[in-house]
Amino acid sequence: MQRALLALAAGLVLLLFAVLPASAQMPGQIIVAPPPESADQKETALESSFRERLVEPGRLRITGDLAKKLEGLPAFLRDTNFTFKPRTYYFDQVDPSGKTEEAWALGGSLEYKSGLAWDRLWVGAEFFGSWPLNTGPNAGDTLLLTSQGTSYTVLGQAYVAANLSETNQVIAGDFTSVDTPYASRQFNRMTPNAFQGALLNGFTSDEQHRLHYLVGYLGKIKERNATDFVPMSQAAGSSASTGTAIGAARYTRGEFAVGLAEYYTAQVMNIAYLAAAYTPKLAAPYELKLSAQFTDERSLAGASGTPLPNQLGIEAVGSRDFAVLTLSFTQTSSAGNLSSPWSDAPSYTRAEIHDTSRAGENAALGMLSYHFNRFGLPGVSVAAVGAYYWDAVTTTSNPQPNQTEVDLYLDYKIPNGSLEGLWFRVERNWEWSAGGGQTTQWRAIIYWEIPLI
C-alpha cells in the first residue's frame, strides 16, 4: 500500500510540473474508466463499438485576439489541435508461486489533429512513450514497459480520415479508435492497442429506428507495449500473415437494441458475436438494463470451420441515486478456452486478474459501485467486484480449480475547473484458487488530457 500511495503522490507532482496551464481540460477518453453513475450509462461491448464518429477533426480552441489573427488561414491549419496526455501507472503483482511483477512508469502521448480540408478531410497522429520511474522484479511482465523492462517510444497513430457525409466516415492508416468486442484499443496500461487498416463507420439518420454499421479490414496490430505492427493472424498465434475482415451492426428501436459483429481471419479463425439489450423506462430514481450476449468461435486452420468454444452470457444492471448494482453470469463450452487475441474478451464476468474464460467454465460476477455526488464529493466513486468461477475442464496434467476474485476500486475524476478530467485510481485485487494459493495486485493510475492548442 505504501508503494502505491508513493506512486500516486509522486506521479501527481510530476504531472503538475510537466504540464502547461489550460483554461479547460478534456475528459479522459480511456477504456478503463470510473464506474457508471446509473444503469443506462453502463455500456455493453457492442454499444461501445458504435459512435457517430470514430475520430473527430481538430477544432479551433484558441480564443481572443489570437483567434482573430488566425481567421484568414485555411481551416486545415487554423483548427490544428495538439493535446498532451500525461499518464503514470504503478503495478505490483504477486502470484501463487511467489513471483513478483513490479514497475512504475511515467509517460503518455502527444496527439496532433489537423482541421478540415475541403470541409471533409483531415489527418491525425499520436506519439506515445513510457519510461521507468522504478523497476522491480520482472518489470517487463507488467506490460508497462518493454518486455525487458526498459522505456519505449512509438508512433501509434498516423491516419487520414474523411466525413463522406453527415452519417458516414472513413479512416485509414494506423489508428487506436477501435472499440469493438473482439478488437479494441484495450487501454489498460501505458499505451493502447493500435491497428493498421481501414474502416467505414456510419448510421441511419432516423433516431427512433437507428442502424449503426462498421465494416473494414484490419491488417495488423501493434499491441500495448510493442513498438512494431504484426499481422492480426500472428497476434492470434498463427504463422500465417493474414489480416482480419470485420463487419458489425447494431439496430436500436426505443428501449431495445440488438447487434452482431463478425471477425474473419483467413487461415486462422472466425469469431461471431451477438448481443441484445433492453433498457425499460422505470419511475425515477430507478433504472434498469438487461443484456445478453453470445460468442461463437471456429478454427479455419486445417479442417475449415472446426468448432472452438462458444460462450453465453446474461447481465442485469440496476441503479438508484448513484448506486449501481451489476449481476452477471457466463457459461463457456468445453471445446477450449475462449480466445480473444486482439483485446480483452467482452465476457460479462471478466475481472482484473481472471481475464480469460476457461473451457467448460461457469462464472458469476457481482459489482456494486457508488458515486458520492449527493455528499458534495462529485467525481469520487468506489466499486467492489466479487466473482466466482467453477467447473472448468480439468485433467490430471492440467488441473483447473475453482477460483474466487475480489477487486476494490477508488476513483477520483475532477469534474470541472482548471484541473477538469484529471483522473486518479487506486485498486486492490485478489484471486484465490480452491487448490490453494492466491494472486494479489496493487494498481495506481493518474491520467489527464490537456489541450495545448
Spans of model-derived segments:
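Transmembrane beta-strand segments that form the barrel wall of outer-membrane beta-barrel proteins
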Residues: 84-90, 170-178, 182-185, 213-215, ...
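Outer-membrane beta-barrel channels and translocator barrels
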Residues: 77, 116-119, 165-167, 204-209, ...
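Sequence/structural signature of outer-membrane beta-barrel proteins
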Residues: 89-95, 130-135, 175-186, 220-224, ...
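Outer-membrane beta-barrel "beta-signal"
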Residues: 247, 366, 408-412, 438-453
